[in-house]
Amino acid sequence: SPVCTPSGQPCQPNTQPCCNNAEEEQTINCNGNTVYRCA
């Protein structure tokens, strides 16, 4: 299953969205990689 970067944790490259509610997903850029963090 996909693993997201939990809120408040450092960026992790190449993670996938995993929040149940898309509105809780925040797309951020970390060193040129698109990563996902749960709001």
Swiss-Prot record:
Protein task: Potent inhibitor of insect, but not mammalian, voltage-gated calcium channels (Cav).
Domain of life, per lineage: Eukaryota
Site (Critical for insecticidal activity): P10, N29, R37
Pfam short name (any one): Omega-toxin
Localization of this protein: Secreted
This protein's name: Omega-actinopoditoxin-Mb1a
Keyword annotations from UniProtKB, A to Z: Calcium channel impairing toxin, Disulfide bond, Ion channel impairing toxin, Knottin, Neurotoxin, Secreted, Toxin, Voltage-gated calcium channel impairing toxin
Processing after translation: Contains 3 disulfide bonds.
Molecular function as annotated in GO: calcium channel inhibitor activity; toxin activity
Cysteines engaged in disulfide bonds, as pairs: C4-C19, C11-C30, C18-C38
Main localization, broad class: secreted
Tissue: Expressed by the venom gland.
Species in which this protein is naturally found: Missulena bradleyi
Comment, domains: The presence of a 'disulfide through disulfide knot' structurally defines this protein as a knottin.
Residue intervals passing through the bilayer: none
Family named by the database record: Belongs to the neurotoxin 08 (Shiva) family. 02 (omega/kappa toxin) subfamily.
GO cellular component labels: extracellular region
GO biological process terms, semicolon-separated: defense response
Keyword presence, Disulfide bond: yes
